[in-house]
């Protein structure tokens, strides 16, 4: 039995998220499993580094699978990409030892959320960014983003249906910056709660629109109640861009996405 790690890029527009759903509901995981199972000529189960909601994208989702099939790495990639839908692509594959696990060996995960701030919606970026037409106080939003760094109880910033046993997370960095008409939130943490990034972005957007002051974030944390925070930002602008592992696994580190933004590393 061989174990392989894979790096996957996908658009989440047509899928109900990463994780396999009930029959008849398209998921990224199930779509890839069906193709890999054909190539391996045996059932394949894919284990992802994380879960993404419906409509959320990824530029380097890490996953792993076990198989008895013997194929060259190029054969796996070319075979899979020739059969996968055009909105899913295997970017790399590497044979691993059985100690590796895409989810449980991950030490951190990283997301970017992209807002297009302009009067008119961008037709060619439909569902790839979140469009905000109102004028935003970007400098205020930049300062507010840093309030989420460090170790906090994120009860207020997780979905009511979140199944995690505990809401404390350590955020290594939470930075918002301008890139032309785009606003990009870059956030890395040891783990994320359901809707955590989208709720943080929703809070920042409301601050940018002058709905409350930066210090109100402290009161939100203290409340430990989802109702104390504002909107959940749409899934459209959210990208899973990286997953981090101990150096011993030596996984490929592709450029951070989304690639069409041409952002600095």
Swiss-Prot record:
Its EC number is 5.4.99.12. The keyword Phosphoprotein does not apply. Substrate binds at residue 111. One of its GO terms (biological process) is tRNA pseudouridine synthesis. InterPro entries: PsdUridine_synth_cat_dom_sf, PsdUridine_synth_TruA, PsdUridine_synth_TruA_a/b_dom, PsdUridine_synth_TruA_C, TruA/RsuA/RluB/E/F_N. The keyword Membrane does not apply. Keywords: Isomerase, tRNA processing. The active site is at residue 53. Formation of pseudouridine at positions 38, 39 and 40 in the anticodon stem and loop of transfer RNAs. Homodimer. Belongs to the tRNA pseudouridine synthase TruA family. This is tRNA pseudouridine synthase A.
């Amino acid at each position: 039995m061989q174990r392989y790690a894979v790096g996957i890029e996908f658009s989440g527009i047509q899928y109900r998220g990463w994780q396999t759903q009930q029959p008849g509901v398209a998921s990224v995981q199930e779509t890839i499993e069906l193709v890999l199972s054909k190539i391996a000529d045996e059932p394949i189960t894919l284990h992802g580094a994380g879960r993404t909601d419906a409509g959320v994208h990824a530029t380097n989702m890490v996953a792993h699978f076990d198989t008895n099939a013997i194929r060259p790495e190029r054969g796996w990639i070319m075979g899979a990409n020739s059969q996968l839908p055009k909105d899913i692509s295997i970017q790399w594959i590497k044979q691993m030892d059985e100690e590796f696990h895409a989810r449980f060996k991950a030490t951190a995960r990283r997301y970017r959320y992209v807002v297009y701030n302009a009067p008119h919606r961008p037709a060619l970026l439909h569902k790839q960014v979140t469009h905000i037409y109102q004028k935003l106080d970007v400098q205020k939003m930049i300062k507010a983003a840093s309030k989420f760094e460090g170790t906090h109880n994120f009860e207020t910033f997780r979905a009511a249906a979140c199944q995690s046993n505990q809401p404390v997370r350590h955020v290594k960095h939470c930075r918002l910056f301008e890139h032309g008409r785009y606003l990009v939130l870059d956030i890395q943490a040891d783990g994320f709660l359901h809707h955590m990034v989208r709720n943080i972005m929703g809070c920042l957007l409301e601050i940018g629109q002058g709905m409350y002051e930066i210090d109100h974030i402290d009161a939100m944390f203290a409340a430990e109640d989802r109702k104390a925070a504002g909107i959940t930002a749409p899934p459209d602008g959210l990208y899973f861009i990286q997953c981090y592992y101990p150096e011993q696994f030596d996984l490929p580190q592709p450029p951070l996405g989304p690639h069409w933004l041409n952002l600095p590393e």
